[in-house]
């Protein structure tokens, strides 16, 4: 009897094990394969996210463009938060005419400009009854009521940055480096500025202001529509960098105005011109021509505000100016000793017309402050600090909306965790700090003009993007969701914490290979950025941003690699002390933090193989990759995509903000990160990759590195992407690039 029971028990256990194995085998067989081809295909594994998401001026409607994976076909949708109605406003056939796919642009640099700087393909009219489309430089006016579109201008020359007057009766735009205006109905256009050229930009944004100061427009209508304020940029003294198209039989050259560290900058001047034409009235805030005017706008009719940033970027002045008399007054000055003053879009004048918001990290972290001024005689006295609205050891990451009627400011911050982005509100009296967003992860909100609704793009580490329309209390309706990624069986990385040598907390993450892919000691790949422009360790979905592809790392982990990332001191979204730790001394501290974190990682995870470690990065991460391989013998291999190899090669605003002028004797960055000079110190196998049309980090950087490595007798691998820009965008090129990096690590570490 006992034997019989034992037999039955063993039989049941055997059947259970068989069924479990069969279930596991079935799950494996139904799991979708994740390959470099699928990860970097157009649309990726999640689908193409909605584009050009906007609120109508009357705050009743949210609009967006949804395209197919290839980006060739699409529709413009609207959503009404009051009724929860979602519908197609402009169908595929009409949208193809009004907003053609970017693939029709043959110039990679222009495509990158549009995507990188979020150039909108359409804008709403002030009465919310029309849309103005920019179809490859040709303007079309679309009437919502009847679904018809008429071409606004038939000029063979492209028009850019179009804007309706506040009453919607006129339209301003840029053409051939000058500012024009014309009636929306019948009537002729009028040229408002003169002598525009590639050396003289009237109302147009140049490359360095767009890239490093996030300037998206350089002209603005007055509230009454009578005047336009604009910035003139004189670039005649700026050196031009040649970008060569090598593909024709006879190569062509395009010259880009690009001020490098220590070079002359654009000379800027703020002007006001009547929308009816006439002489420009110039506003002259400072005697020093070597300044930046990074932001300006209208306080009210006849009263301008503008900011003046010194070249060292450690002093920012706010001015008010009477456009009728030309008189101006400095309202406040923001200084940052041994640091820099951040320029952003958080200056907001309240509807009361006598108060404004002002961001500052004067107390050690970026917080919001409320100032007031004399509404009747604004130039009679300085601005007065009313109160600090937020405080704490967290970063306010952007004002997202204002509800003046409720006395509320909505803003993004990382109060809960430096790796998250949450939406908060605070009252204008400084009380009632409250979190609005609910889910853990990263929320990017944009409010309607009345401050009553917002759209939220949300994602988390293992949750791909989702678009929602929400009320100000945080109750949301889903508008769009990514495709389900569960069939790909992605492995969640582990969030980790480390200590720098000075005790500072560093945040990192580790992705270990699945048990089926691991055998013996595990080789480790370090992904690095390490600079002021990017935080890699976040609770957000990173599918295929070039510098840190989460899906590429998932693929590597299935090949038996562990992937590690840590944000060293000098990366953003932490307090002032953390961000400025590397000021004037790029390289050494970043590498110290990386190596300190790696020592702690190896102690915590003894299965990692210290003798098989690689490193890779893009842009600043590529610079740090080469720096690490020339200043440490830990790394057996590395891949550097589009690196700065000498900071004298990079643009003036970014470089000098962090490193001072090349003549500054207190800065070591120009000597310590002159990577060609230490080419003979290279350890490990280097793969270097760059696009020849990179207008951001010039191809010149890699050419100089190649020459130095050859002179030093160092063997290395070099891949050139013809006519590709900094992002080396496109499914074909990205697939090729990431296969190269994959093969490099398989060859060197396996």
Regions found by a protein language model. Name each.
Residues 1-2, 78, 530:
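Disordered, low-complexity tails and leader-like regions
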Residues 2-15:
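Bacterial N-terminal signal peptides that target proteins for export
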Residues 6-7, 257, 566, 731:
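Short alpha-helical segments used as structural interaction elements across diverse proteins
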Residues 9, 18-20, 26, 563, ...:
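Generic detector of N-terminal low-structure segments
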Residues 9-10, 182, 232, 269, ...:
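Basic side chains
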Residues 13-18, 23-453, 459-463, 469-472, ...:
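Beta-propeller folds
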Residues 239-240, 295-297, 307-309, 442-750:
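Serine-hydrolase catalytic core recognition
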């Amino acid at each position: 009897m006992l034997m019989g029971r034992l037999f039955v028990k063993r039989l049941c256990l055997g059947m259970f094990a068989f069924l479990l194995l069969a279930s596991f085998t079935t799950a494996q067989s139904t799991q979708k394969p994740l390959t470099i081809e699928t990860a970097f295909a157009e649309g990726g594994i999640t689908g193409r996210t909605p584009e050009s998401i906007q609120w109508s001026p009357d705050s009743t409607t949210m609009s967006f463009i949804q395209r197919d994976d290839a980006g060739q076909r699409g529709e413009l949708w609207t959503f009404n938060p009051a009724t929860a109605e979602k519908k197609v406003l402009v169908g595929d056939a009409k949208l193809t005419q009004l907003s053609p796919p970017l693939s029709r642009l043959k110039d990679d640099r222009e495509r990158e400009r549009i995507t990188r700087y979020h150039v909108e393909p359409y804008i709403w009219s002030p009465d919310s009854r029309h849309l103005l489309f920019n179809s490859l430089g040709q303007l079309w006016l679309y009437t919502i009521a009847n679904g018809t579109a008429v071409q606004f201008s038939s000029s063979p020359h492209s028009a850019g940055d179009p804007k309706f007057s506040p009453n919607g009766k006129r339209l301003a735009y840029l053409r051939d480096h000058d500012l024009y205006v014309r009636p929306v109905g019948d009537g002729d256009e009028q040229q408002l500025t003169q002598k525009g050229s590639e050396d003289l930009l009237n109302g147009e944004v140049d490359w360095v202001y767009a890239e490093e100061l996030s300037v998206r427009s350089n002209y603005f209508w007055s509230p009454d529509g009578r005047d336009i304020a604009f910035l003139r940029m004189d670039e005649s003294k700026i050196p031009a960098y040649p970008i060569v198209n090598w593909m024709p039989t006879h190569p062509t050259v395009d010259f880009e105005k690009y001020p490098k560290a220590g070079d002359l900058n654009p000379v800027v001047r703020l002007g006001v011109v009547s929308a009816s034409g006439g002489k420009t009235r110039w506003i002259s805030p400072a005697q020093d021509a070597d300044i930046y005017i990074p932001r300006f706008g209208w306080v009210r009719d006849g009263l301008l505000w503008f900011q003046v940033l010194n070249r060292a970027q450690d002093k920012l002045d706010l001015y008010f100016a009477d456009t009728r008399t030309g008189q101006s007054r400095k309202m406040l000055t923001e200084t940052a000793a041994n640091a820099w003053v951040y320029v952003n879009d958080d200056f907001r004048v309240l509807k009361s017309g006598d108060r404004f918001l002002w961001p500052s990290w004067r107390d050690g972290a970026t917080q919001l402050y409320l100032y007031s001024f004399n509404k009747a005689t604004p130039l009679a006295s300085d601005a007065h600090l009313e109160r600090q609205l937020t405080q704490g050891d967290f970063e306010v990451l952007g004002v997202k909306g204002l509800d003046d009627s409720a006395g509320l400011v909505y803003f993004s911050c990382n109060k809960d965790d430096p790796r998250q982005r949450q939406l908060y509100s605070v009252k204008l009296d400084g009380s009632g700090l409250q979190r609005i967003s609910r889910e853990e992860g990263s929320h990017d909100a944009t409010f309607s003009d009345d401050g009553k609704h917002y759209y939220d793009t949300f994602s988390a580490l293992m949750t791909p993007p989702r678009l929602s329309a929400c009320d100000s209390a945080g109750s949301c309706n889903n508008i769009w969701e990514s495709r389900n990624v569960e069939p790909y069986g992605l492995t969640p990385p582990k969030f980790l914490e480390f200590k720098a040598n000075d005790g500072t907390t560093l945040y990192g993450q580790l992705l270990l290979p699945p048990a089926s892919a691991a055998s013996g000691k595990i080789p480790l790949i370090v992904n690095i950025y390490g600079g002021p422009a990017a935080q890699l360790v976040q609770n957000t979905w990173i599918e295929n941003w070039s510098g840190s592809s989460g899906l590429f790392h998932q693929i590597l982990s299935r090949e038996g690699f562990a992937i590690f990332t840590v944000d060293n001191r000098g990366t953003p979204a932490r307090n002032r002390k953390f961000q400025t730790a590397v000021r004037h001394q790029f390289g050494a501290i970043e590498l110290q933090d990386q190596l300190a974190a790696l020592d702690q990682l190896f102690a915590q995870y003894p299965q990692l193989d210290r003798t098989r470690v690689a490193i890779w990065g893009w842009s600043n991460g590529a610079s740090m990759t080469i720096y690490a391989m020339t200043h440490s013998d830990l790394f057996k291999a590395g891949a550097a995509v589009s690196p700065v190899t000498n900071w004298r090669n990079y643009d003036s605003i970014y470089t000098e903000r962090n490193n001072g002028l090349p003549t500054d004797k207190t800065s070591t960055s120009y000597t310590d990160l002159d990577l060609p000079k230490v080419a003979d110190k290279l350890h490990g196998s280097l793969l270097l990759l760059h696009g020849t049309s990179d207008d951001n980090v010039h191809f010149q950087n890699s050419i100089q590195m190649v020459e130095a490595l050859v002179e030093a007798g160092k063997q290395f691998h070099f891949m050139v992407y013809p006519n590709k820009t900094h992002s080396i965008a496109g499914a074909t090129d990205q697939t090729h690039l990431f296969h190269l990096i994959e093969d490099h690590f398989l060859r060197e570490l396996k």
